[in-house]
């Protein structure tokens, strides 16, 4: 009997009250775990994100001989082994689709005295890693591709123009190299800033320009305690929901190191109002379109911006979002396709122009095993459209792939049920339980946030 994907009806919200404390950022979480492992001493990390990416990094570090206590309620203790204290793993390290684990680990393992094979799920094998590998090879590392040239999986035997993780990996492993590392042509500079700011481990860095960084060779002393700031990308979904009025969203201040913390300014241009030192947005009416923007520095929040623009009056065009093509899915194609299916007018090209959704009261959105897609396409329910997320099952080629979608912010369920007093708590609990159950073909239903239930309209979600 074929596996039946359930639907989860969410009731509309007329009043929303509560206080949100954001979970940690995915990129900062994994950078901090790796730096803690390579440090000398014990590092207590607080504010850690509970996600598939973080679990991939934690499992890999444990296989490499690092003792880690937790995580428990966003807190874990990492017993650092030093730059050369990692041990040969018992087998290949499977990292799923966690680019924030694959690239930094590739660099950190390049000068270890043992061979390591890094593998991932099918999507990982489509995400290029050749720039990092080329840079490491120039520094003397011996790395072999096991399948397609330039892509994982790879065996390590011992910059950042497409994805910031390329330079991130080099920045992290720089102390193990004999020379300073320089890289240019950055497309995601805010993510580079994250790495530079997550170095209270005693590593001096200099940001000469937006094109050149230099990191001096030195050891990593542990900072003892490392508190991670909240995830600005996760905040963007709540901030974009017109039905969530005056709900404080804390964990990210005005001086956040994350590029996506720019998102409230974009919303102000569209008619929202922010106040206070934390990210609090109080919509003062229907969102309206704003001027064009270069969204390359906020590739994740740009997805939320594009979806919100499709619900606004007029059109908006987030431009130069090149990094979308090499994320968890080809997000440029996915966003264009799904916005078009929802009734928006999509202009082909490197940019994306969203126009108000029209003419449909119900539509299906494919999340393509990408949690960011699932989060974004819950927003159209604010416009009176019931949305059903089919996960991967509608297309045979997708159904044959075994891959989890629930990767980034599972804490959103706790926010919806507890912090915001969600009237659809029962449905969300059922959905959260379903997320942990593997379907017949190994697929897991996509993570769907509370946003579809906001304001006057209900969203119906399902596998």
UniProtKB/Swiss-Prot annotation:
PROSITE patterns: EPSP_SYNTHASE_1 (PS00104), EPSP_SYNTHASE_2 (PS00885)
Cellular component terms (Gene Ontology): cytoplasm
Enzyme type, top EC level: transferase
BP terms from Gene Ontology: amino acid biosynthetic process; aromatic amino acid family biosynthetic process; chorismate biosynthetic process
Active site: 300
EC number: 2.5.1.19
Catalyses which reaction(s): 3-phosphoshikimate + phosphoenolpyruvate = 5-O-(1-carboxyvinyl)-3-phosphoshikimate + phosphate
Pfam families membership: EPSP_synthase
Protein name according to UniProt: 3-phosphoshikimate 1-carboxyvinyltransferase
InterPro entries xrefs: Enolpyruvate_Tfrase_dom, Enolpyruvate_Tfrase_sf, EPSP_synthase, EPSP_synthase_CS, RNA3'P_cycl/enolpyr_Trfase_a/b
Binding of phosphoenolpyruvate, residues: 26, 99, 127, 165, 331, 372
Record key words, sorted: Amino-acid biosynthesis, Aromatic amino acid biosynthesis, Cytoplasm, Transferase
Main location: cytoplasm
GO molecular function: 3-phosphoshikimate 1-carboxyvinyltransferase activity
Annotated positions binding 3-phosphoshikimate: 26-27, 31, 163-165, 188, 300, 327
Subunit structure: Monomer.
Residue intervals passing through the bilayer: none
Family: Belongs to the EPSP synthase family.
Subcellular locations according to the entry: Cytoplasm
Biological role: Catalyzes the transfer of the enolpyruvyl moiety of phosphoenolpyruvate (PEP) to the 5-hydroxyl of shikimate-3-phosphate (S3P) to produce enolpyruvyl shikimate-3-phosphate and inorganic phosphate.
Originating species: Burkholderia pseudomallei (Pseudomonas pseudomallei)
Pathway assignment: Metabolic intermediate biosynthesis; chorismate biosynthesis; chorismate from D-erythrose 4-phosphate and phosphoenolpyruvate: step 6/7
